[in-house]
Amino acid sequence: MSLEPKIPLPNSLQKPLSRFYEYLRSEKGLSLHTQRNYKQQLETMAAHLVTLGLKDWSQVDAAWVRQLASKGMREGMKASSIATRLSSLRSFFDFLVLRGEMTANPAKGVSAPRKQRPLPKNLDVDEVGQLLDVNEDDPLSIRDRAMMEVMYGAGLRLAELVGINLKDVLGRQGEIRVIGKGDKERKAPFSGLAKEWVDKWLKVRGALASPGETALFVSKLGTRISHRSVQKRMEEWGKKQSVASHISPHKLRHSFATHVLESSQNLRAVQELLGHENISTTQVYTHLDFQHLAQAYDQAHPRARKKNKD
């Protein structure tokens, strides 16, 4: 959507705008800069109305305002810019309602998209391979590789990884039972390499675990490993394996999502695998059955196939 309207506005659209500009100048006392911003935003939207065949502001409804916000998102506008555009519309329609030219403000209930936090830069497949190429045979190294393989193989959150109990490893099915946000349980697939290293870890876990400890991954003290310990160990392995990027549990999860999405182009499957209720602020949760998820996972995940058996 261009910043300046290229289409002449009919009087039915232009005159209410002119009255509003005068109101901003004489009664609101806004600066020239702010007035120009209002003018730019509103006349751009008025030109868009003309392209849709609308000739009067009273024809605008909430659906049109939402479509306008969505259009801005599709065109790559920043969330803050869309919020400014909606704010201009709300102020203008409040003015028209006050003057009796409209009965209600159609922009009143339309929210601007939330400003999203930037996602961390993901590791590429080669960097993941470099990080996970841990072949030391002491119990802590085996544990650490198993943790990283599971986190990347299933796209788990840090809390989900730490919360896994022995009973949650469903080896025959190639699944791990995890408790996600809101205490919601789901079964996550994990790759052949992740399963291979979990099996190796289980063989040496007894050397560290305290009697009766139910956690899959334990610390040197024999109890469930802490969030901070996982973060610290991953950072250390990133440096030891000479991976250029800073390593964090969330970066592994983000890398999982990016790699599977790039391979499968199946956004809904990735949504389900990650345990997300909402795929974005504009998309609702779509459930896929586990068989379809597992199939998409097996075909797409770069470490999903175990090496040829001996």
From Swiss-Prot:
GO terms for biological process: cell division; chromosome segregation; DNA transposition. Its main location: cytoplasm. It is found in: Cytoplasm. Keywords: Cell cycle, Cell division, Chromosome partition, Cytoplasm, DNA integration, DNA recombination, DNA-binding. It comes from the Bacteria. Residues 118-298 form the Tyr recombinase domain. One of its GO terms (cellular component) is cytoplasm. Coiled coil: none annotated. CDD domains: INT_XerDC_C. GO terms for molecular function: DNA binding; tyrosine-based site-specific recombinase activity. Pfam families: Phage_int_SAM_1, Phage_integrase. Residues 11-97 form the Core-binding (CB) domain. InterPro entries: CB, DNA_brk_join_enz, Integrase-like_cat_sf, Integrase_catalytic, Integrase_recombinase_N, Integrase_SAM-like_N, Recomb_XerC, Tyrosine_recombinase_XerC/XerD. The active site is at R157, K181, H250, R253, H276, Y285. Site-specific tyrosine recombinase, which acts by catalyzing the cutting and rejoining of the recombining DNA molecules. The XerC-XerD complex is essential to convert dimers of the bacterial chromosome into monomers to permit their segregation at cell division. It also contributes to the segregational stability of plasmids. Forms a cyclic heterotetrameric complex composed of two molecules of XerC and two molecules of XerD. HAMAP family: Recomb_XerC_XerD. PANTHER family: PHAGE INTEGRASE-RELATED, TYROSINE RECOMBINASE XERC. Belongs to the 'phage' integrase family. XerC subfamily. This is Tyrosine recombinase XerC. It comes from Vibrio atlanticus (strain LGP32) (Vibrio splendidus (strain Mel32)). The lineage of its organism: Bacteria, Pseudomonadati, Pseudomonadota, Gammaproteobacteria, Vibrionales.
